[in-house]
């Protein structure tokens, strides 16, 4: 590629503002342009980089048995209605009707469609296991696009899906994907942490995220440096203290005027927060199959010294989205904001943390202005509809595995894998005949990587004050050839010859043949960030050597013209070998072995 004819120009400064310096560099390097909120166009350099990333994905997925397919972005809504996600997913799922009035969706993920295909293509256990994958543009109407490619509305996604006869087969596939993901990210040059995560709207029994640690990330992780435990905050468990076990005492009402917070309550009564119960009032909107929207009121209770985890609450009540109840809604169930508890309320789903359920004689709201109750006990004073872990893990909490302190870190999720089990196959009737002739639901897994988000994280990781420093495996070109004279000169003739010989040797070259000052060309080479730069000018002709510069290290060397091609081929091979050396098997966490 010659820069004199390249579509798209480098920029001295990035248009607009972004909290991601990597995103600013992608714009300055003529990789992409923003065309709308959360919507981007890739220019030739950026799209070539995306294709390099996709090549890594294809190679590793095919290595573990994946077969590439292409599924439609437009899905019949009926498939999504059969699984229920049409009704539980909010406005981020784009819904529309065709001219015949049929409901359709723009699929932001393809569990329904691939299950439909599995139902039609897999008949017997002899056809299992199978795995398919695709690389496709998707749309999710995200309400808060941010940080360039990190949070967008339209995006390129690699999604893969596996079919197995049973949970043991799925566990084997899950382990293979876990290892393949680590290989993919290392081959691309991105350090990631694999952490337990919430299954979210995907459903299933187990999920892991692959997270790039960065201060600009939206995800909060809980990490134990002692034993290696790591989880997204939405799914993180921790070692909870032992509950109080004193015998039930008599329920007693006590005046607490103005004590509408746990802090005020503990100060007024002189009790520790650990002996109080905190009420959280939430609401979930549920759309029925007739598209009637009903609102479910939820009252969650955690210990006063802890915080509620809305994701865990939503999982227990099977609600995709929760919102705070209004004061009017709180009154409707017989509660009082600031003095609320499940005691005496009606028309509400009560969700209680396991530690509260096991504790005795807590202080809780009396559902009367200025009043609380002493000695509240679950089972006697109110009944829980759901009991489980609904508290949020925090820095300093005890690791559930080893008891050491947890710490927090921020990061960006670049990939996620799920054990779906039979959720979708059961809903859509995707079955196979086993060896005994019995019909059984297919056991499924799904595995996704955000390709654009991966590029964004690579730009964040591989940069300096001058520009990008892209790994050789994903850089749009391997060599930046810079001519510091006009094309008709002796230096120009040498540069053209080197350009042709490099391409003939299989080296991908971006040739800066523009009529520009040397400073402009060097600045552009730095911001684009190809692994190696070759400079040829009048001094090169006089010395009989070209300057070769490593972008990552900044080290330069004079290489005779008759050795330039061989030297660059050698250096590219060495850069690839350095990356390959990072691809080593790792010990997998115990949870991925469980069927």
Swiss-Prot record:
Keywords, ordered alphabetically: Aminoacyl-tRNA synthetase, ATP-binding, Cytoplasm, Ligase, Nucleotide-binding, Protein biosynthesis
Gene3D superfamilies: Anticodon-binding domain (3.40.50.800), Bira Bifunctional Protein, Domain 2 (3.30.930.10)
Catalytically driven reaction(s): tRNA(Pro) + L-proline + ATP = L-prolyl-tRNA(Pro) + AMP + diphosphate
Protein location: Cytoplasm
Listed EC numbers: 6.1.1.15
GO biological process, any: prolyl-tRNA aminoacylation
Keyword Transmembrane: no
Keyword Ligase attached: yes
One Pfam family this sequence matches: tRNA-synt_2b
Assigned GO CC terms: cytosol
Chain positions covered by the region annotation Disordered: 1-22
Subunit structure: Homodimer.
NCBIfam families xref list: PRK09194.1 (NF006625), proS_fam_II (TIGR00409)
Family membership: Belongs to the class-II aminoacyl-tRNA synthetase family. ProS type 1 subfamily.
UniProt cross-references to HAMAP family, sorted A to Z: Pro_tRNA_synth_type1
Function of the protein: Catalyzes the attachment of proline to tRNA(Pro) in a two-step reaction: proline is first activated by ATP to form Pro-AMP and then transferred to the acceptor end of tRNA(Pro). As ProRS can inadvertently accommodate and process non-cognate amino acids such as alanine and cysteine, to avoid such errors it has two additional distinct editing activities against alanine. One activity is designated as 'pretransfer' editing and involves the tRNA(Pro)-independent hydrolysis of activated Ala-AMP.
Domain comment, as recorded: Consists of three domains: the N-terminal catalytic domain, the editing domain and the C-terminal anticodon-binding domain.
Identification of the protein by name: Proline--tRNA ligase
Organism of provenance: Salinispora tropica (strain ATCC BAA-916 / DSM 44818 / JCM 13857 / NBRC 105044 / CNB-440)
């Amino acid at each position: 590629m010659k820069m004199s004819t390249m579509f798209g120009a480098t920029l001295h400064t990035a248009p607009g503002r972004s909290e991601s310096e990597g995103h600013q560099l992608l714009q300055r390097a003529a990789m992409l342009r923003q065309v709308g909120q959360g919507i981007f166009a890739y220019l030739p350099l950026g799209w070539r980089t995306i294709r390099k990333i996709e090549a890594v994905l294809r190679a590793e997925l095919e290595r573990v048995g994946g077969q590439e397919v292409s599924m439609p972005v437009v899905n019949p809504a009926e498939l999504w209605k059969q699984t229920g996600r049409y009704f539980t997913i909010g406005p981020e799922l784009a819904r529309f009707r065709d001219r015949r009035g049929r409901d359709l969706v723009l699929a932001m993920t393809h569990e329904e469609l691939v299950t439909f295909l599995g139902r039609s293509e897999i008949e017997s256990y002899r056809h299992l296991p199978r795995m398919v994958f695709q690389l496709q543009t998707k749309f999710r109407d995200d309400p808060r696009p941010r940080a360039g490619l990190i949070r967008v509305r339209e995006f390129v996604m690699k999604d893969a899906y596996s079919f197995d006869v049973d949970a043991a087969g799925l566990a084997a596939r899950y382990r293979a994907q876990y290892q393949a993901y680590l290989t993919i990210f290392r081959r691309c040059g991105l350090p990631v942490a694999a952490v337990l995560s919430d299954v979210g709207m995907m459903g299933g029994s187990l999920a892991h995220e692959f997270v790039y640690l960065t201060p600009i990330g939206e995800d909060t992780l809980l990490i134990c440096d002692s034993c290696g435990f790591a989880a997204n905050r939405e799914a993180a468990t921790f070692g909870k203290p032992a509950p109080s076990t004193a015998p039930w005492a008599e329920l007693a009402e006590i005046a607490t005027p103005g004590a509408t917070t746990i802090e005020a309550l503990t100060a007024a009564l002189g009790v520790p927060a650990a002996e109080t119960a905190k009420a959280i009032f939430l609401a979930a909107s549920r759309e029925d199959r007739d598209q009637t929207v009903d609102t479910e009121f939820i009252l969650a209770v955690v210990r006063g010294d802890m915080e509620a985890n809305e994701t865990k609450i939503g999982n227990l009540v099977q609600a995709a989205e929760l919102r705070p109840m209004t004061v009017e809604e709180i009154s409707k169930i017989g509660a009082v904001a600031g003095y609320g508890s499940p005691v005496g309320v009606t028309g509400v789903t009560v969700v209680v943390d396991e530690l509260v359920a096991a504790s005795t004689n807590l202080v809780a709201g009396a559902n009367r202005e200025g009043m609380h109750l002493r000695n509240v006990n679950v089972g006697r004073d109110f009944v829980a509809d759901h009991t489980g872990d609904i508290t949020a893990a925090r820095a300093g909490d005890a690791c559930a595995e080893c008891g050491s302190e947890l710490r927090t870190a921020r990061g960006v999720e670049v990939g996620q894998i799920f054990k779906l089990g039979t959720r979708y196959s059961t809903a859509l009737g995707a079955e196979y005949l086993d060896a005994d002739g019995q019909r059984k639901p297919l056991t499924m897994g799904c595995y996704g990587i955000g390709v654009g988000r991966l590029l964004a994280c690579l730009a964040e990781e591989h940069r300096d004050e001058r520009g990008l420093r892209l790994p050789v495996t994903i850089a749009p070109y391997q060599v930046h050839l810079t001519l510091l004279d006009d094309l008709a000169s002796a230096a120009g003739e040498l540069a053209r010859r080197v350009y042709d010989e490099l391409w003939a040797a299989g080296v991908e070259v971006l040739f800066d043949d523009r009529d520009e000052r040397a400073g402009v060309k060097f600045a552009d080479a730095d911001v684009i960030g190809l692994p190696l730069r070759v400079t040829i000018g009048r001094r090169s002709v006089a010395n009989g050597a070209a300057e070769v510069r490593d972008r990552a290290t900044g080290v330069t060397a004079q290489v005779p013209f008759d050795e330039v091609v061989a030297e660059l081929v050698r250096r590219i091979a060495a850069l690839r070998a350095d990356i390959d050396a990072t691809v080593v098997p790792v010990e997998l966490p115990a949870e991925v072995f469980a069927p």
